[in-house]
Every structure is written in structure tokens, then in C-alpha cells.
């Protein structure tokens, strides 16, 4: 049975991809975890989750998403997230986990400053939910599936092809975010407070929480 190993701050210790190409595509199912769920954790990578079958009760920070087959969720870097069965039904999914630098390249790049960092640091954007309710969701979904296929086939130049498709996916998302979206920067205090709350909830998951 699978289990997510974390450190004291709930940071996942698993390496996603390699130093040369920090991207990993993996197939999972909730029933494959010891508790029938993947519990609260975070990592510096962005994670895209595509539900293949069943359903997942997906939580990101304070947000809850009721995901079904075909739904996609892009979780921001460094956000706390967890996934649970809903109505005791299993959920099968594929995850694309990658470091943001695949999109922007060098640290001093204008791509990082202009198109990536503002998203990563926006506390009001813990995740973007793709439920096919808008026309651009179909385009986004096609990019996700293309990345999965490229990774699985690993043909010549696949790293370049994945990087290019990932950049197109990122552009598709950015240009369709609401124009009036509030911008709230992350702070260490906010992140630590959130992790303390989630840590308490996780350790008391099987117990009745006393309200005082």
C-alpha cells in the first residue's frame, strides 16, 4: 500500500522526476493508499491531477473540490492538499508533477518574473479547477493529455515537446483567469498557520473534534 512520506512541516519527501528534468507523470488510485486517501502534504512542485475514473474529494488549503471523471485540478506550488474517497467510492487519477522552472528556464528570466512568479505567490490562487464548464477547459484538457502521452511514449525530443506543451498550457490558463482576481501574497506566517491547522485535523481525523 502506498503512503506519502513527509517531514515535520508536512513537506512530501518524494522526488518528482530528476534534477535534469523535474517532471513526473504517475498513475494512482485512492484505494492504493493505506487510509484510502492521500493525506495533507505539500511540495514545491505544481501538480496537475486528471481524474480517470470514479470521484475524488480533493482539498487544497481551505478549498474543496468534488472531482469526477474528466475533471482536472492544477494545484499551485507549496499548497497543502489532500484527497479522500466520497461516498466510499474509489477514484483513479493521473498526476503531472513538475517544478515551475521547466516553464521559465533561468531564474533571471522575464518568463519567471512576468508569467510564473505572480501566479505562484498569489495566496488567492491555491488551485485552478477545470470542469469543462468553459470553452477553454477543453483546450487545457487536450494539453494535459498530450503531456501524458509524450511522457509515456518518450520518443526523441520528448523533453522539448513536453516543455513546449506545458508552456502552451500555462498560457492558456493565464489568459483565461478572471481579470478581477484578487492578488494576495503568501507569507510564512499564513503558510505556517495553515499547516498547523491541517496537521491538527489530520491527527484528529478519526477522533471527534471538540468545539470550545
Predicted regions and their residues:
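Generic protein-terminus/edge-of-domain signal
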Residues: 1-72, 78-79, 87, 111-114, ...
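Detector for the N-terminal beta1/A-loop initiation region of ABC nucleotide-binding domains
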Residues: 57, 82, 204
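Ligand-binding loop in jelly-roll beta-barrel domains
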Residues: 78-103, 108-111
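Aromatic/histidine-rich interaction motifs
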Residues: 113-141
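Short, Lys/Arg-enriched, Trp-marked, Pro/Gly-tolerant hinge/linker segments that flank
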Residues: 126-137, 151-212
Amino acid at each position: 500500500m502506498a503512503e506519502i512520506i513527509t517531514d515535520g512541516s508536512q513537506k512530501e519527501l518524494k522526488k518528482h522526476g530528476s534534477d535534469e528534468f523535474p517532471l513526473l507523470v504517475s498513475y494512482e488510485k485512492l484505494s492504493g493508499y493505506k487510509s484510502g486517501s492521500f493525506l495533507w502534504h505539500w511540495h514545491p512542485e505544481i501538480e496537475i491531477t486528471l481524474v480517470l475514473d470514479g470521484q475524488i474529494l480533493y482539498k487544497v488549503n481551505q478549498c474543496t473540490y468534488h472531482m469526477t471523471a474528466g475533471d482536472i485540478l492544477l494545484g499551485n506550488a507549496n499548497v497543502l492538499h489532500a484527497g479522500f474517497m466520497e461516498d466510499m467510492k474509489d477514484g483513479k487519477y493521473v498526476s503531472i508533477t513538475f517544478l515551475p522552472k521547466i516553464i521559465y528556464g533561468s531564474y533571471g528570466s522575464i518568463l519567471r518574473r512576468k508569467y510564473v512568479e505572480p501566479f505562484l505567490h498569489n495566496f488567492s490562487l491555491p488551485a485552478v479547477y477545470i470542469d469543462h464548464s468553459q470553452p477553454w477547459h477543453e483546450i487545457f484538457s487536450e494539453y494535459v493529455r498530450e503531456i501524458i502521452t509524450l511522457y509515456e511514449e518518450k520518443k526523441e525530443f520528448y523533453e522539448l515537446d513536453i516543455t513546449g506543451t506545458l508552456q502552451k498550457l500555462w498560457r492558456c490558463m493565464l489568459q483565461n483567469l478572471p481579470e478581477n482576481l484578487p492578488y494576495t501574497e503568501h507569507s510564512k506566517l499564513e503558510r505556517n498557520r495553515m499547516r498547523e491547522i491541517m496537521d491538527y485535523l489530520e491527527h484528529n481525523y478519526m477522533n471527534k473534534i471538540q468545539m470550545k
